[in-house]
């Protein structure tokens, strides 16, 4: 007797790619408008990018301006929320909103169809009317190709590969880059007890204090956002000068462009001080010129100086990594960045949205709900109803249990066709 093929589940009207803060914000915003969305996540839990960051990481935006609508980050998580606490919060958020998340599904390619979009995934093809891509701004670590690096006898790592700063205790570290991630990890490296820390700087960074006299600076950036750019930059320079003084004697001259102009023209955001400047002034770290090449065990700098570090740590930024997914659609610029503005329709690609790819000094986490609401409102205006009528994932795979050792109990979603694991959110109890 032949076993009949299972009937494919009706496809959701919206598919979201990525279960980080941006993807979760999008799903919740759509839910509030009565629109069902399925989130496809290649990892085995929410917040994959956060899980892959070093353990000392904390938000540099204040707690109450970093949460998502509908659930506050608990007060007992402190003013500056830790990586682990933020991951826990996102899990609670997914459970609180009963979001439909399909884990262990890698979206490989996106293509147009006569009636919408088709996603090619590791679990089969998925058809839908609308797609929101929210895979993350800092998705693919970028490492320069320095001459001679193949012969360098010691590790060369991107900061994204570092699990804990304490792992480098007692070592001589050359940190390349003094942007946001470089300034942040430098403080942790000194605190962890590295033997020596050189910070290679090509362009002097804009650095702002996280707080002044115990008062967080983050809310002030919201007040400044209505001013013209030149006045915002002037205010930022004044704040930096009052907080740090002149850092030129310590190897960091005043940047040519203010933080807002630099963000607009280069996409490089401001660095937030978490101890970097104090360590610089007390000579616990040293600024050196740009790394140009390697010569055997030597790291050769632009001014001819040679260092012999035990490890080179590159804080050289990230790429969006969107080319395999959408590069063939003509929706990305030459830098691989979406051509659409924050929360705006994608030119010549109706039904395709990008969320979380535009940084803001006011805080990226604060931006995600703003963009999500814009997208949800626009999608709602295109739908006469919230019915489902397109074909879902075609292949069938058994559902899997939670990862070994997990203390979180997961609940199966109503729709599991073709996915490795589905959840309507983690069974955790939010605290307040």
Regions found by a protein language model. Give the residues of each.
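A short acidic, helix-capping loop that chelates divalent metal ions and anchors anionic groups
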Residues: 72-78
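Conserved N-terminal glycine-rich FAD pyrophosphate-binding loop of Rossmann-like flavoproteins
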Residues: 44-72, 207-224
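Flavin (primarily FAD) cofactor-binding/catalytic cores of flavoenzymes
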Residues: 2-43, 47-49, 78-211, 221-395, ...
């Amino acid at each position: 007797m032949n076993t009949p093929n299972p009937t494919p589940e009706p496809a959701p009207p919206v598919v979201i790619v990525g279960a980080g803060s941006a993807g979760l914000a999008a799903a919740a915003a759509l839910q509030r408008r009565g629109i069902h969305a399925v989130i496809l996540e290649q990892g085995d839990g929410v917040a994959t990018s956060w899980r892959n960051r070093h353990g000392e990481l904390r938000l540099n935006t204040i707690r109450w301006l970093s949460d998502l609508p509908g659930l506050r980050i608990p007060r007992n998580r402190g003013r500056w929320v830790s990586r682990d606490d933020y991951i826990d919060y996102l899990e609670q958020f997914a459970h609180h909103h009963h979001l439909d998340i399909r884990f262990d599904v890698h979206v490989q390619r996106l293509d147009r169809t006569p009636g919408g979009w088709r996603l090619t995934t590791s679990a089969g093809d998925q058809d839908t009317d609308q797609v929101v891509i929210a895979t993350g701004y800092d998705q693919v670590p970028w490492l320069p190709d320095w001459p001679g690096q193949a012969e360098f006898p010691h590790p060369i790592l991107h900061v994204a590969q570092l699990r804990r700063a304490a792992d480098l205790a007692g070592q001589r570290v050359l940190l390349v880059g003094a942007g946001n991630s470089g300034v942040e990890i430098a403080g942790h490296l000194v605190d962890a007890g590295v033997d020596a820390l050189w910070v290679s700087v090509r362009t002097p960074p804009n650095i702002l204090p996280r707080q002044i006299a115990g008062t967080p600076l983050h809310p002030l950036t919201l007040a400044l956002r209505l001013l013209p750019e030149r006045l915002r930059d002037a205010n930022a320079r004044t704040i930096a000068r009052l907080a740090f003084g002149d850092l030129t004697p310590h190897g960091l001259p005043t940047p040519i462009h203010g933080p807002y102009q630099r963000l607009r023209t280069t996409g490089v955001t401001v660095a937030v001080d978490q101890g970097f400047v104090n360590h610089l002034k007390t000579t616990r770290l040293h600024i050196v010129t740009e790394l140009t090449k390697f010569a055997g065990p030597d790291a050769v700098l632009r001014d001819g100086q040679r260092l012999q570090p035990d490890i080179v740590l590159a804080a050289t930024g990230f790429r969006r990594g969107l080319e395999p997914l959408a590069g063939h659609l003509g929706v990305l610029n030459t830098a691989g960045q979406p051509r659409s503005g924050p929360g705006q329709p994608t030119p010549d690609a109706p039904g395709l949205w990008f969320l979380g790819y535009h940084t803001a000094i006011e805080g990226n986490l604060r931006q995600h709900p703003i963009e999500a609401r814009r997208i949800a409102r626009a999608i709602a205006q295109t739908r006469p109803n919230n019915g489902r009528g397109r074909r879902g994932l075609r292949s069938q795979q058994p559902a899997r249990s939670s990862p070994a050792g997990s203390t979180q109990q997961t609940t199966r979603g109503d729709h599991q066709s073709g996915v490795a694991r589905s959840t309507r959110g983690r069974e955790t109890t939010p605290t307040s």
